[in-house]
């Protein structure tokens, strides 16, 4: 959010909310660039997808990076004179991180495709070979480059075109595959025994070895705004590997009944996607949510007989990139999996007269307890707005927090902004209660998407030594609160915080 969260007072009023299980999906085929193979790699908040595809019958010799947007698959080309390019990740500005060769060399250079131009990151890396595997909202990229015998992970900072080169855990090689909004990285680095170990890198904490699940090796592929890393790691006896999530401790998230699995991507809600073998040893794409791994083939319509074998990316709206492949990187169909339309429910506003605090909820059990007086002192204001009860294309999950710092006064804080959510989570005074509903978000100028209404966010500036926020779709209510000294927070001149579906 443009306005940083003021550190509010939250007192525990309501039971933590459960995160919804994986929804059903509808498959949208991406098409091709004229060849037989296509591979999708990344997806942004708008549902645009990066990847690469064969452009003719020559196969890998003429694979080009692509951008899929609004039903159109666009060939992003190569550096001047090149024959190959690859797209590995995409941000909300439709910048695609990848690599390309050129007429001057057959070696690949890390690049960023942006608006019809190609930025050669090798100008700043000065390497023999380089790749850009990840990119964040600020245009910072991560990958690996080689100037001698071994690759080293790097981070490219768009501000100043600065390069940060990572070390290893005593071995020769490191590579970065993921970057989050704060510039934290995920990847792997070799130990002195030349075993690959997954890492998390932050400016404050440096390069942290995440270890394994008991075996010799692990790799990190994705990193969430909160710093959680996903990837794959070997079990004792080097069995596996199994997909993992590391939130400070590495957790095995299992398989679909087979011997191996890999997690490639995680979103702000903690939804994970990847691939796993099933009980018959066949590769299947999976989604992992609410503690359960689900075969995407069992919850997806519109596949036309194809079998999804891998899923490589998931955005915060729950849209997934998945492929049907016959071998490693030999994929004949790529899809965007859109969550089936979610039900709209009302978020009801309550007021506590003694505290002069406001609270909203869309959770039926909470509404029933508030209305029946189980939670004393709260009454309906008559205000409400619509939200989605589950993942919805074009909507973001909303984090809900509380803190006992200013008890007994009670307040809750809500944000659909992954960056803001991660900032609040990092503060020891706050507790994340859950992801309580999904809602569209405004553009930077405060404009809401079609068929939605602005939800204004207002802050009481700590009146009564217990800060509180109010969320309303009413311009009259907004004006009244501002006249009473409340401060508008959000996007654009009207400080819009969310956009309620109508």
Q: Which residue ranges define each predicted feature?
A:
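Extracellular glycan-binding segments that recognize GlcNAc-based cell-wall polysaccharides
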Residues: 342-502
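Sec-dependent, cleavable N-terminal signal peptides
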Residues: 1-22
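Generic secretory/membrane-interface signal
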Residues: 11, 16-17, 29, 69, ...
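Residues embedded in well-ordered secondary-structure elements
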Residues: 10, 168, 303, 390, ...
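Compositionally biased, intrinsically disordered/low-complexity regions enriched for serine, proline
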Residues: 13, 20, 26, 233, ...
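A generic alpha-helix propensity feature with a strong bias for hydrophobic helices
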Residues: 5, 19, 26, 32, ...
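Residue-level hotspots at or immediately adjacent to binding/recognition sites across diverse folds
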Residues: 21-341
